[in-house]
Amino acid sequence: MDKEILTMEEAAELFGVSIKTFIKLLKEEKVPGRKIGREWRFSRLALINWLASGDSQAYSASETEVKEFFNKVAPQWEEIGRNYSDETLKTKLIELNILKKSMILVDLGAGDGFISRFTAPFVKKVIAVDISGEMLRELGRKAKAGGIKNIETLESDAQDVPLADSSVDMVCANMYLHHIEQPELALQEMHRIVKPGGVVFLADLYEHSDGDLMNKMHDRWPGFDPDQLVAGFKRTGFQDVRYEMLPGPPVRTYCGSTPEPVRTGTKVFIIVAWK
């Protein structure tokens, strides 16, 4: 029989979200619960009834939907994302001269390892973080086939990474942020785990109006205005923040077992931010 009274950890699991996201719900959405001393307790029935009402379902579903989508498409991701991973990013990483042999680099939303596998030879260690276990298995398979041995994988919500404060030298986030329910929370997590003097390299979509794309790719955001995102980095505490639009043709993305183009005309930008 299921427990009727739940701890915060058990309640977050019921919602299908991270502890950090659940705490935000507690503060903003009046989740039914009772604080006894320093501990929270929740009625399973009350939570289920709350989840069944109104827009609250979106919060619990968002992380689960993204995870299920990427678990499903992982075996075909090399074809689906063929033109989603811009080769120009590799050139920019080299041009910026920010990869060092002594570095521990975290790749948030690593997917099948487009960034992880490229950067691994240039750094001491890569920690590839993704919410999808199937994607990480694809990454591991491809890394092994390529003889790459310095990538660790970590299945985790990238908004709540189980890494110590100021413990890594660099964070990469390629085509990750538009899948996140709360982008500013993700920026705060990047700031938390990177060392003083460390750097974040982010690539994402310029804002667009392609609703069909968002539905097919389970995007939470229609890209971003880079100026607003730069302001978000600065609010989070990053000291030196720069962005540029990538040159070249717009991104083309494919979705489905028989690849079918679903995006044209969407540009990509990068942000480089030092703590």
What is the meaning of each model-derived region?
Residues M8, V31-D55:
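Short helix-start
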Residues M1-K20:
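Polyanion-binding surface elements
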Residues C172:
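A conserved beta-strand element that flanks and buttresses the S-adenosyl-L-methionine
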Residues E184-P196:
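A short glycine-rich, Lys/Arg-flanked "PGG" loop and its adjoining helix->strand segment in the class I
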Residues E78-G81, F201-V272:
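C-terminal alpha-helical "lid/dimerization" subdomain adjacent to the S-adenosyl-L-methionine
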Residues Y59-K100, F114-F118, E138, A145-G146, ...:
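Conserved class I S-adenosyl-L-methionine
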Residues V106-D160:
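Class I SAM-dependent methyltransferase SAM/SAH-binding core
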Residues F15-E39:
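Major-groove DNA-recognition helix of helix-turn-helix-type DNA-binding domains
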